[in-house]
Design a protein with these regions (language model features):
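Membrane-proximal basic amphipathic "stem/tether" segments
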Residues: 1-77, 85
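Extended, charge-rich helix/loop segments that form flexible
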Residues: 101-171, 176
Length: 282
């Protein structure tokens, strides 16, 4: 008896589903290409509910690794010099990062977020790497475990030996010499890739800089990097005026009363808005 291809496909789908898995066409999961959209991107959230969005965002409105408030553009000069001098990039980046990690050593998660000790008491006793934004879904234990696993995986992949978060966190100092080398190497590899083939993207899971968009009631918006931190750091430091980002979610200022950490009483609305508004400061 001949078995047609459709029957085989149905049989395979049933097997996959019986294992608790689901197969979906790429056209349903690839981001909506909205790079030509010029007005407030929040509009797209209503046009394409539940979909990830591809935007071309002004670089000056973005925040991420080595480019948070108070440290913006410190890599710009050295990154261009590193780009123009193949073979010297690691030495140049190492010197710059050593200064950054020595200068920026917040005592705890509260200081990392820029709030006083009395404004977020839970964060005073937490190390900087346990900081979270007021709009994050609050599960401190899960977030801590995930961040530790991510750092361990990234460090081990680059260094070739086990190195956990006790050696330091990429966003601030202090860091060990091994952790410094991990960050130097990650930036250098991105820089070399851009030098070789330009800035590339694809529709896969790791194909873009992933971000959330913060929207103000007056129409202004900013974006925060969630994934692709080193790509963002290099591209922004090289002076690109805009970046292609994949937007995963929108955070509306007027929804502050609904933000998870606010409803749980971990942040007051006043402090939550202070953290939010810091991203809109000139």
């Amino acid at each position: 008896m001949l078995i047609d291809s459709l029957s085989i496909k149905v049989w395979m789908l049933r097997k996959v589903e019986s294992a608790g898995l689901h197969i979906q066409s790429m056209k349903h999961v690839r981001p909506v290409d909205a790079r030509r959209h010029l007005s407030n991107p929040l509009e797209l959230n209503y046009l394409y509910p539940g979909r990830e969005l591809l935007l071309e965002a002004p670089m000056e409105w973005g925040f991420g690794l080595f480019n948070l408030s108070g440290h913006r553009r410190f890599l710009n000069d050295v990154m261009q010099e590193a780009f123009d001098n193949p073979g010297r990039e690691r030495d140049l980046l190492r010197d710059a990062l050593r200064v950054f990690y020595a200068d920026w050593q917040p005592a705890n998660a509260a200081e990392f977020l820029g709030v006083s000790f009395g404004q977020a008491s839970e964060l005073v006793d937490a190390p900087p790497w346990q900081a979270y934004s007021p709009w994050d879904a609050h599960n401190a234990v899960e977030k801590s475990v995930k961040r530790q696993r991510t750092e361990l995986r990234e460090n081990t992949r680059i260094l070739g030996k086990r190195l956990d978060i006790s050696a330091g966190w990429k966003f601030c100092g202090p860091v060990s010499e091994d952790k410094l080398e991990v960050e130097v190497e990650r930036l250098a590899r991105v820089l070399e890739s851009i030098r070789r083939q330009g800035i590339c993207r694809h529709d896969g899971t790791d194909g873009d800089i992933r971000a959330c968009v913060l929207t103000h009631s007056d129409g202004r918006w900013r974006w925060m990097v969630h994934g692709g931190q080193h790509r963002y750091a290099v591209i922004s430091a090289l002076g690109a005026p805009r970046a292609i980002i994949r937007v995963e979610r929108f955070i509306r200022r007027e929804d502050v009363a609904l933000w998870p950490t606010v409803t749980l009483g971990l942040f007051s609305q006043e402090i939550a808005l202070k953290i939010f508004d810091n991203y809109f400061a000139d």
